[in-house]
C-alpha cells in the first residue's frame, strides 16, 4: 500500500549545506545568520524590520506585551482558530472575546466583530487560515468607524489612535492580497516556521510590522530583543563582537530567541521559496479541477485580488456531519493517505469550555468544522502521488454515499 504523509518538510541539500556552514562557523546561537534571515524576511514582506524568535506564539505574545496589553483589556479573536491565537491573551492577563464565523465562511463575521468593539478593546487578531488572507479592508473600516470608543492606555496605543490589528499569519508567509505582501497589511503580523509550515526552520517564527507615524523602527526592534532575551541589553554575540562583557538586565523578561542553526534552514528555504510556492499552487489547481463536480466546498486560494501561501487544502463535505467526515478520514488513512482536520473551534477545547465558552454560541464555527477535512498538499508531493490522493478521494466518496 502506498503512503502519502500529510505534511513532510521540503528540505534539500541547500538547507543541509547552510546548517553545516553555521555549525562550522563557531557560532550557533543567535548571531549573524539570524540577522541575515531577519533582513531577508523584512525584504520579502516589504517591512523595515523583522524579528525572528522561537515560535509564532512567542512573537505574538511579545507583540501584545510591547503594546501594553494586560488586565482589563479585551482582544477579539475568531472562535475558529488554533489555541495559540487565544492562549497568549490569557498569558498577558487580558480577556479574549471570541467571534463566530460568518455563515459558510472560515473567516470571522465582520459585522459581529465590529459590534464587539468597545472601550476595553485594544487588539483584533484576524487569522489568515490555510494561508488565505482575511478581508483587511473590512477590518480596518471597522476599527476606523469605532475610533471614538478607543481608550488608549499608553503612548504607543495613543499613536495608533484606534484598535490595533495584529494578524495571526502562522499559515500565511508569502501570501499576497491586493498587491501587498502578508506582513505589510495588518499593523503587526506574526508568522510560523514550524516543521509543518510551507516554509520552515524546524521551530521558529517572525514578527513584522508596517511603518506607522511616530513609531521608531529601531526602538521597536530593541523592545523585541529585550523581551526575548531576559531583558538583557546585550546578547552573547554582541558581547563577543565588541569584546565587552558588561551588560545590564533592565527587566525580568523571557527567553525565546532564534538560533543561527535554525535560521540557517530558513535562509536556504527562502532561496527556494518561490519554487515551493509555485508547486503548491500547481497542486491546488489540479485538486480544484478534479473536485469541481463533487459535492465539496474548497477555499479560494487565488484570484485577481489575492494569492494565498497555499499552506493547507481544505474540503468541506456539503450536507454531511462529523461522523461522515471521521469515517472519510479513516478510510483515506486505510488507503495510506494521511489527512488532518483544521481546527477544532476553541469552545470545543477543554481549556476554553472550562472558562465558560460554549460551542452552542458559535454555531457557524461548528458547522464549518464538523465536515471539514484537510488533504495532503505540499511541495514534496509528486504528480503521481497527487493523482493517487485524488483517485483515493473519489473512491472514498463513492463508497461513503
Predicted regions and their residues:
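N-terminal "arm"/small-domain region of PLP-dependent enzymes with the aminotransferase-like
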Residues: 1-27, 32, 248-250, 376
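Amphipathic, non-transmembrane alpha-helical secondary structure
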Residues: 17, 61, 110-118, 137, ...
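Phosphate-binding glycine-rich loop
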Residues: 27-74, 88-90, 98, 147-151
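PLP-dependent aminotransferase class I/II
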Residues: 34-39, 47-50, 123-127, 132-140, ...
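PLP-dependent aminotransferase-like
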Residues: 65-169, 176
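A short alpha/beta connector and helix-capping loop motif
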Residues: 107-113, 179-189, 393-394
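Conserved active-site segment immediately N-terminal to the catalytic lysine
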Residues: 153-200, 245-249
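Active-site PLP attachment segment
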Residues: 171, 184-234, 260
